[in-house]
């Protein structure tokens, strides 16, 4: 009986060795040759030797077709060169290879690639071709503001005003971002809907009551609608929380000037000029901390997408 058991164990171990030999290595198995190729490829990419880096990354993928380091390297090379179709191919392979814990950063990258493809089509006057990419970007990451804005812009370019407004309104349920609200405000102004303009910012403020940028925007809308008392009240509320905000004093000066209160207007203008950047609301990058006077789709310092937020005073 014991001899039979030993025989079974021996046969089982033999089968296991055969199966192990036939099994493909894990995609990112850290063998010395792959690590050395990856090191050389990354070094070449960082030194600007793009062709050499690309050759080395592809060499890795010949034996390990789902190697994440090589795929990400090819994606980054393509993105740096503005070759977004190639970046998309690499990114789709990455999405297929990563585990669920890594999926979120990679879906953000997928949104970036689709956005850049759509943006290029839009800049070339091909709004119809841009829309599928821009919508794919929003599907990949619904918090990716540049794509949400551009979907509506593409519809507007095509003369599809209602579709543009619907796209921005859907996005506004997720984002309380000033560039998005500004587009909706412009659309409501064109439609002659002043109460909707006011409600737009009031609703956004209800969702984010500490957002002073939204509070100032509401005051600006009151001012532009000639609701001077409401505008003054709104700006004075903001002034209590942030007395050194130049934009508040610039608008208060304009309110007083419209009322004919020249001395008070002069004083507010003087304070705004002393503090600087009178009618601008500065933004700051969440990733690197760089400041910019206005919102942009990418940080001008670190070049990351969708990272600029209204700066807190």
Language model region names:
Residues 65, 99, 142, 175-176, ...:
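Short coil turns that delineate tetratricopeptide repeat
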Residues 24-63, 79-80, 113-129:
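Alpha-helical segment of the N-proximal tetratricopeptide repeat
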């Amino acid at each position: 009986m014991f001899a039979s058991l030993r025989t079974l164990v021996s046969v089982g171990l033999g089968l296991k060795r055969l199966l192990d030999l036939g099994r493909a290595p894990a995609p990112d198995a850290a063998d010395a040759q792959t690590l050395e190729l990856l090191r050389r490829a990354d070094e070449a990419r960082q030194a600007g030797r793009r062709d050499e880096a690309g050759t080395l990354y592809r060499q890795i993928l010949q034996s390990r077709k789902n190697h994440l380091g090589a795929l990400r390297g090819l994606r980054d090379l393509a993105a740096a060169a503005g070759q977004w179709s190639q970046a998309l191919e690499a990114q789709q392979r990455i999405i297929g290879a990563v585990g669920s814990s890594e999926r979120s950063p990679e879906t953000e990258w997928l949104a970036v690639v689709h956005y850049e493809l759509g943006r290029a089509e839009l800049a070339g006057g091909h709004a119809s071709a841009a829309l599928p990419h821009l919508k794919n970007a929003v599907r990949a990451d619904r918090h990716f503001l540049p794509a949400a804005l551009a979907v509506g812009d593409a519809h507007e370019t095509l003369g599809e005003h209602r579709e543009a407004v619907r796209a921005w309104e859907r996005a506004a349920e997720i984002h309380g971002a000033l560039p998005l609200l500004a587009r909706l405000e412009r659309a409501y102004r064109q439609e002659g809907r002043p109460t909707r303009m006011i409600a737009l910012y009031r609703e956004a403020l209800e969702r984010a009551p500490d957002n002073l940028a939204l509070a100032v925007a509401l005051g600006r809308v009151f001012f532009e609608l000639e609701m001077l008392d409401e505008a003054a009240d709104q700006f004075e509320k903001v002034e209590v929380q942030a007395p050194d905000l130049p934009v508040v004093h610039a608008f208060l000066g304009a309110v007083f000037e419209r009322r004919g209160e020249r001395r008070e207007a002069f004083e507010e203008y003087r304070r705004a000029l002393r503090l600087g950047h009178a009618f601008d609301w500065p933004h700051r990058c969440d990733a690197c901390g760089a400041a910019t006077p206005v919102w942009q789709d990418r940080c001008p310092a670190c070049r990351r997408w969708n990272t600029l937020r209204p700066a807190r005073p």
